[in-house]
């Protein structure tokens, strides 16, 4: 999926939130956002399954994807640092987490650190997204 298609279908409130975080959207992020690794996150809920729980306990206005969350983290970092590498680190911080990851972390006894489901990013990208891996190498960024 291309970034423009993702953005056109984005909830207007999330679009506004992105603009509040960083009035300038760093265009260098677009090829990374369009990668298989990150586009996968558009279908992974940020709420780790809580969106499907009782509406008496949770009353979310709408769902937010892990991709939305990752972009917002990158925009926060960009707004304060204007550092490409730190911004990419923020963008990719959830790249390898599976759906319901924090639920599985809890089942794994890792409810404090919530890292048991995270895979090594370099190995993940090398294996599942060689195009992105080669792009990182081409621009001289170590994962």
Where are these regions (language model features)?
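Metal-dependent phosphohydrolase cores
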Residues: 1-143
